[in-house]
Amino acid sequence: MPARHDILCGAWDFLWKPWGSIELWESNIAHAMKMKGIATGIISDHPHLFETGGENYHTDFGMWDYVRGHEGDPWRLRDDPSWAGTPALPAAEGWFRHAYDTSRTWFRDETDYPGPRTMSATADWLDRNAGHHDRFFLFVDEFDPHEPFDTPEPWAYRYHDQRDEDLLIWPPYMKDAI
């Protein structure tokens, strides 16, 4: 989040400003461009841009497209009833179960994952808007690589000699976790 703040606000706050929102008193490039008649947009699957504590990242853009389903985004409330165990098992039930573990039961192939959907939405935006604006600024924020490290086939094992049956997508950031 601090890096995004610096990019959009033209600030050098990365090392000093904590993780958080664009403050109401701060100017940002999306607003300045919009005021000059430049078409602006943001396409992102980054859930923290759209949640409490990360607010105001999208509000000054002329349009925004939030690609749902990554990390802690509560995109789905229940597992897909037809889920057959692919792409991988969700985490066990309990307080530590992530919203992503529910969302991912709805993924069937590469095109269902947030990263590829973000890039597809970007290509669609460019196709739809080509030739319609003299100038535009499109900010594309792809959350990966970031936990969960959940890579769809055929990419997951492209550079491995053998399949790792204990594929961990949520690194155990605690002592004696494995």
What residues fall within each predicted segment?
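Catalytic domains that recognize anionic headgroups
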Residues: M1-I178
